[in-house]
């Protein structure tokens, strides 16, 4: 019997520079011959690296992994700010960074590490009164997005280069979903009084998915294969709880099980190794939050 989910799962793409995340989705729709394609976590056109894309029922799973932590390698230029907070924008202000000492840079980076309030980049996909912020900025509007809590668990300097009036910092960042690396560049430049923006960005991790898992687009065009089946995606993203065939059937129908004292979300896997659902304890019930293999399939 053919598995109804054999074409459902995730593709981990190494996005090239110059393409939007939506461009990548469009190509994968053509490669996999389906309209049911979506991505988790937008990458700016200038950015490269890990873009997780759902295929078929894998698109339904994306909503349950967007809160994952992410990691980036980036280059920050100190000495000028831009209206987009990256190299694609127009310069707005700046001061020579020649007098900025390494100790001052380290101090301000430490202040941007941990649980912080961050103002998102104005040129972003965040919606303001139903319209994306970047659309309002490009229409000439002034957009000031409110700060929101994010977590920067790692903000390390890998290399420092002093070139004329500028300082270029190669950095490695690990952060919560929703953190803007462009905003870190902007805020570091502002704190140092010289302005700052991002000149390069490469995403190296999204949750459990890393560059080692990623495939270039040209390879996917030649051989459109899933990086992980939906079964593998659930089991890799969450701790596994083995269930009986009877329990699996109940979960597939959206029914709940007796509580087991579990904390957090688990992937319920049947004796055949198939991921049936994501489950959480809610009060006195062990209930589904996402059913990968509904009984209606």
From Swiss-Prot:
UniProt superkingdom: Bacteria
Membrane spanning stretches: none
Active site feature: 44 (nucleophile)
Reactions catalysed: uridine(55) in tRNA = pseudouridine(55) in tRNA
EC number(s) reported in the record: 5.4.99.25
GO molecular function, one term: RNA binding
Pfam families the record matches: TruB_C, TruB_C_2, TruB_N
Entry keywords, A to Z: Isomerase, tRNA processing
GO biological processes: mRNA pseudouridine synthesis; tRNA pseudouridine synthesis
General function of this protein: Responsible for synthesis of pseudouridine from uracil-55 in the psi GC loop of transfer RNAs.
Family indicated by similarity: Belongs to the pseudouridine synthase TruB family. Type 1 subfamily.
HAMAP family referenced in this protein's UniProt entry, alphabetically: TruB_bact
Descriptive protein name: tRNA pseudouridine synthase B
Lineage, uppermost ranks: Bacteria, Bacillati, Actinomycetota, Actinomycetes, Mycobacteriales
């Amino acid at each position: 019997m053919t598995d109804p989910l054999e074409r459902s799962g995730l593709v981990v793409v190494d996005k090239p520079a110059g393409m939007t995340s939506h461009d990548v989705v469009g190509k994968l729709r053509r490669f996999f011959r389906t309209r049911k394609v979506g991505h988790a976590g937008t990458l700016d056109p200038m950015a490269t690296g890990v873009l997780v894309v759902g295929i078929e029922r894998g698109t339904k799973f994306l909503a349950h992994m967007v809160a994952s932590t992410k990691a980036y390698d980036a280059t920050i230029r100190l000495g000028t700010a831009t209206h987009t907070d990256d190299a694609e924008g127009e310069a707005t202000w700046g001061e020579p960074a020649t007098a900025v000492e390494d100790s001052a840079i380290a101090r301000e980076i430490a202040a941007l590490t941990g649980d912080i309030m961050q103002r998102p980049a104005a040129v972003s996909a965040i919606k303001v009164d139903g319209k994306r912020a970047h659309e309002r900025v490009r229409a000439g509007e002034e957009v000031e997005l409110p700060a929101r809590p994010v977590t920067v668990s790692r903000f390390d300097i890998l290399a420092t280069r002093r070139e004329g009036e500028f300082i270029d910092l190669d950095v490695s960042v690990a952060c919560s979903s929703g953190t803007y690396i462009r905003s870190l560049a902007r805020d570091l430049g502002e704190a140092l009084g010289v302005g700052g923006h991002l000149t390069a960005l490469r995403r190296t991790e999204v949750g459990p998915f890393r560059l080692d898992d990623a495939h270039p687009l040209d390879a996917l065009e030649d051989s459109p294969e899933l990086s992980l089946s939906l079964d593998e995606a659930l089991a890799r993203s969450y701790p596994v709880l083995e269930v009986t065939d009877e329990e699996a059937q109940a979960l597939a129908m959206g029914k709940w099980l007796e509580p087991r004292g579990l904390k957090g979300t688990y992937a319920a896997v049947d004796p055949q190794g198939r991921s049936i659902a994501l489950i959480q304890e809610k009060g006195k019930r062990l209930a589904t939050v996402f059913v990968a293999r509904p009984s209606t399939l």
